Amino acid sequence: MKVVEVKHPLVRHKIGLMREGDVSTKRFRELAAEVGSLLTYEATADFETEKVTIEGWNGPVEVEQIKGKKVTVVPILRAGLGMMDGVLEHVPSARISVVGMYRDEETLEPVPYFEKLASNMPERMALVVDPMLATGGSMISTIDLLKDRGCTSIKALVLVAAPEGVAALEKAHPDVELYTASIDDCLNEQGYILPGLGDAGDKIFGTK
């Protein structure tokens, strides 16, 4: 599995700000979108282009346009919504596919509860977004679902990942690409990433 830990100074700085214990909901939400945008920039760097001729201000001009599969952004509810706007800055015409997963606090296993995907999934590249890759369960289950619907071109974008989650995702889906702002130290007994960001969903939505 291709794993890219984006080490751009802006990414490192913004993730550092997100780790502050007293970060406000507004600030955390803004930073989640900003880092999501920067991860998208990296994840789309290998998109193929083709030359086309358009009518410019002074006559025909040859330009490059992205070709290949159309993009669908797949936020995993609910926390993935916090990264979605940042992703859409770069691919504003992308279709949005929504998958609802929550983690059982006792078993730490993902439980699906909602699915609304774009049409023609086999023809699309999916950018799956979720702030945290902890055990990897929610991401793996979401990718399972996408593949069941015929989508074979998939990239996962997460703010922070635990080594355990990276290993689990690689074992389940070695053909998927992972882009993250940070691979942190480990998971604690409750399944939270250390040092991590805390509960990203609560911080994005202002719930406790």
Curated annotation (Swiss-Prot):
Q: Where is the signal peptide?
A: none
User: What are the top taxonomic ranks of the organism?
Assistant: Bacteria, Pseudomonadati, Pseudomonadota, Gammaproteobacteria, Alteromonadales
HAMAP family in alphabetical order: Upp_B (MF_01218_B)
Which residues form each disulfide bond in the chain?
A: none
* Purpose of the protein: Catalyzes the conversion of uracil and 5-phospho-alpha-D-ribose 1-diphosphate (PRPP) to UMP and diphosphate.
Record note on cofactor = Binds 1 Mg(2+) ion per subunit. The magnesium is bound as Mg-PRPP.
Q: Which UniProt keywords apply?
A: Allosteric enzyme, Glycosyltransferase, GTP-binding, Magnesium, Nucleotide-binding, Transferase
Q: Which family does it belong to?
A: Belongs to the UPRTase family.
User: Which residues make up the binding site for uracil?
Assistant: I193, G198, D199, A200
Per the entry, what modulates this protein's activity? Allosterically activated by GTP.
- Gene3D superfamilies per record: 3.40.50.2020
Protein name, per record: Uracil phosphoribosyltransferase
What GO annotations for molecular function exist for this entry? GTP binding; magnesium ion binding; uracil phosphoribosyltransferase activity
CDD domains on file: PRTases_typeI (cd06223)
- Pathways involved: Pyrimidine metabolism; UMP biosynthesis via salvage pathway; UMP from uracil: step 1/1
Q: What class of enzyme is it?
A: transferase
Binding positions (5-phospho-alpha-D-ribose 1-diphosphate): R78, R103, D130, P131, M132, L133, A134, T135, G136, G137, S138, D199
**Which reaction does this chain catalyze?**
UMP + diphosphate = 5-phospho-alpha-D-ribose 1-diphosphate + uracil
Q: Under which EC number(s) is this enzyme classified? A: 2.4.2.9
The Gene Ontology biological process annotation of the record reads: UMP salvage; uracil salvage
Q: What cofactor does this protein call for?
A: Mg(2+)
Q: Does the keyword rRNA-binding apply?
A: no
